[in-house]
A protein has these predicted regions:
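A conserved beta-strand element that flanks and buttresses the S-adenosyl-L-methionine
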Residues: 52-53
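Short, glycine-/aromatic-enriched active-site segment of Class I SAM-dependent methyltransferases
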Residues: 83-101
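Short alpha-helix
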Residues: 103-118, 122-124, 148
């Protein structure tokens, strides 16, 4: 960050921008400009940059629009991160709770959208430890599920405990939570499909 003359931090959440600003100060990065802006808003007044990065922010209603905006903002290259799994919470656990399984678009969706746009993107994978892997006790497992899904009803807790008692706690959660890093050299606007 010290070799970059100016950094723009863009987010729809003022809270997220405040956290990012505090971290920038801690890192002595004083060459950052903060802009509160949503994916759905116009970006025409945002400065074009050499590199655009969208990390953990691409669960959007219109992926094509988001990828187009990032491509058009970057003179050189775009980097985005996307879920590898289609869910933050195991579908098995969602079913054990008696809930409808909610799966989200993962990196394959973004890659397909980019391909349809005429962008031949690269994919690398980031393997990170799963912070919810320790399910060695019922209490710890329940904390992990609540952290991911919010409060549970008494009936859901009962269903979950019955399910937990039938499992090997070491096999409940994967060892890693993986992300896909998708990147491409920016494409001229007129070349996009």
């Amino acid at each position: 960050a010290k070799k970059i003359p100016i950094i723009y931090g863009v987010d729809y959440s003022q809270g997220m921008l405040s956290v990012a600003a505090r971290r920038a100060v801690q890192m002595n990065a004083r060459h950052v400009q903060w802009v509160q802006r949503a994916w759905e808003e116009h970006w025409d007044d945002l400065a074009q940059c050499d590199i655009a990065v969208a990390s953990r922010s691409t669960l959007v209603a219109d992926m094509r629009q988001a990828m187009t905006k990032l491509n058009n903002q970057a003179r050189l290259r775009v980097y985005t991160t996307h879920l590898v799994s289609s869910s933050f919470v195991s579908p098995t656990i969602q079913r054990a709770l008696g809930r409808e399984v909610i799966e989200l678009p993962n990196y394959i969706y973004a890659l397909n959208v980019l391909y349809q746009m005429g962008i031949h993107a690269h994919v690398d994978f980031i393997r990170g430890p799963n912070c919810q892997q320790d399910n060695s006790t019922w209490t710890r497992f329940l904390e992990n599920v609540r952290w991911s899904m919010g409060e549970l009803s008494a009936d859901e807790v009962e269903l979950l405990e019955t399910w937990y008692q039938q499992q090997d706690p070491r096999a409940i959660a994967p060892a890693s939570r993986d992300w896909a890093l998708i990147w491409w050299d920016s494409v001229p606007r007129e070349a996009l499909r």
